[in-house]
Amino acid sequence: MRVLVLAVMAIVLSGTAARAADPRYPDWPCTQAKVPEISLAAVWAGPPLDEVQSKWKDHAKISALVAKLSARKTPLDEAEKLVKEFLAASASDKTANAKLLFAGLFDTLNAQRSQVINGLERVSRKQREAADKIREETLALQALQGVTPRDDAKIEALSNELIWKTRIFEDRHKVVRFVCEVPTTIDQRLFALGRVIQQEME
């Protein structure tokens, strides 16, 4: 039973030790630096988008294409091909359509990214609460083990509960590590599609 207690504490401590690497973002659980939103200048070197940034939603065809290109289930090579086909068919409207398309991608992917970041921070707060609870129950288990006479039924019940809560904690921790990659993947997708759009404009 002592081995169980030590194992539980090791798992909980390893799952929470890396949090708050940046004091500005105490709920950020990832080893990757938190970048709250993508800078337009970092992904777009084309003509200014000021006059089109709020207009892309008015174009049904562009809105539908933005939705398809933004979906992570659409492979990047397929998305790049769709961009090229759309702009090749745009003829004299190519520059205007290119700007509208990128404005839509920028808005949509930035919004997706914000949702992922907010979700990660929500889970991080839940994990912190779960870790505190597991620590409390581990101390309670240790106290029970030192009581004479021993209440073996109560010790077993609390041990089983700790095992269950620790398993959930571990599973969430693994999911968080996976989801931490998503904002970077979105950044890369936006940069790649922006580059293709700019190349097709030339």
Language-model segments: what does each one mean?
Residues 5-15:
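Bacterial N-terminal signal peptides
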Residues 153-202:
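Alpha-helical oligomerization segments
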